[in-house]
Amino acid sequence: MADPSDPMKPDGEVNPIDTDYQIGQDNIVVKVGPFGLDIHNRVFLISGLSVIVFVLLTIVFHSQAEPLFASMRGWLTSNLDWFFISAANIFVLLCLVLIVSPLGKVRLGGTEATPDFGYLGWFSMLFAAGMGIGLMFYGVSEPLSHFSSAYGGTSFEDGVRTDWAPLAGAGGDAAAAERLGMAATIYHWALHPWAIYAVLALGLALFSFNKGLPLTMRSVFYPLLGERVWGWPGHVIDILAVFATLFGLATSLGLGASQASAGLNYLFGLPQDTAMQVLLVIGITLIALISVLAGLEAGVKRLSEINMTLAALLMLFVIIVGPTVAILTGFVSNLAAYLQHLPALANPIGREDANFAQGWTAFYWAWWISWSPFVGMFIARVSRGRSVREFLVSVLLIPSLACVLWMSVFGGTAIRQVVDHGYEAAASADLPLQLFSMLDFMPWAQVTSFIAIILVVVFFITSSDSGSLVIDTIAAGGKVNAPTPQRVFWCTFEGLVAIALILGGGLVALQAMAVSTGFPFTIVLLVACIAVVKGLMSEPRPGKV
């Protein structure tokens, strides 16, 4: 067993990195009465000041910011869609190669390390990492959108394709459109995003548990940069990680605010406008701040567990009350459709469905990549003692299957309402309202819609609270117990960035910043793949897994 006094200490054989660097040696430590700061002098100052300037400029010049964000998103996705799609394919292929190679025998934490959590608890945490505001927002809207686009078929104007259907569409064929729509949805929520998370989580766990380096992004690059990783190259990597995580979280928080606003409008007739979204962000950020100030980590964890239970109960309700047989058979047929269409959906070149590849896929991959430091660090923390093979198989499959089930239940039900009953309220509603419109066709709609709002709000709180911890760890040079005021700063600015983006263009601005920060961090992750392989090759491997 590992030394309980040092949970990061390796167990058994490892090949640690010999470095004189001490965690926090470059930090500025300030103590003022009961308060204090312990910040990395360059990472915190540069990223913190940049975020402050961004928020101020975007709020003050929000009318000028809106067209800027729209053009920025359009340029990045239309010119770099091939890059994002290719990068995501590389992450999947790397995971598959590591699973079947001898490197899969390397154990995180040392050859004798034992898991900190049993399978059930570990799988539950992986499942929890896959749930969030995104599934609540897109669980109904994305399958419906792809189904409708595919059913409408292709259209051209001056020889240029103008429709949003994935691949070649399925003009007029409802069954084929449903299969293609669900396959396209699952493509965005299954193996590819979880491969992105898995690669970074593996790197963080390997270089922390096995190599004895700080739990921060720069540590992953030690095999390539050596001691320079503690200088400016490492500073840049950590600063990019802070930006990516902050804007990735802000995108999710903005989506959550728009959906909560739509739900409150549906239930209570409250205004569904920008002001309401801003008020929701302020209110929920204040709740997250209270949890940070009061040290309610245990309470937030408990709240997250309750939320997961509520999500499971809501899903079970839809399965039982909705088209049960169609949902259960659809889960299998949707997986089959996903595997059938996967090669074409993942093809980065010669695509005719430019709107789908650029407007959906490129955005998603950039968004997932910007989320990767947040989710990757969480997965790394709970995966000590697992072999690389066990780790990758579980991280790829368990959350992917959970996401497929969620999309099959909510998206499949919405599609069946259209096809079997001609109920098109959900399909014609605005994106944030589509979940509530789908629930409105079922019994106890007021109750289930209220539960859905609670789910969105609590996912918002837990994401903000946990995200501030991850950002603070990076900006504190790898220290995991930095002073509370630092987390207050990051938690506050997660909300302020979301507000700035809502004022600066809403969904378009949120997506623009996710893509903008995701692009440079994609380059960081691609280089990290090389570092991870080099790190694994230097590790001792037991004869048996």
Report each predicted region and the residues it spans.
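Helix-loop-helix module between adjacent transmembrane segments
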Residues: N15, F35-L45, L49-I59, V92-C95, ...
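C-terminal membrane-solvent junction of multi-pass transporters and transport-like membrane proteins
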Residues: I39-V43, K105-S124, V325, T329, ...
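Membrane-embedded translocation segments of transport machinery
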Residues: V229, P233-R389, V393, I398-F450, ...
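Hydrophobic alpha-helical segments of multi-pass membrane transport proteins
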Residues: S50, F83-V100, A311-G322, A402-G412, ...
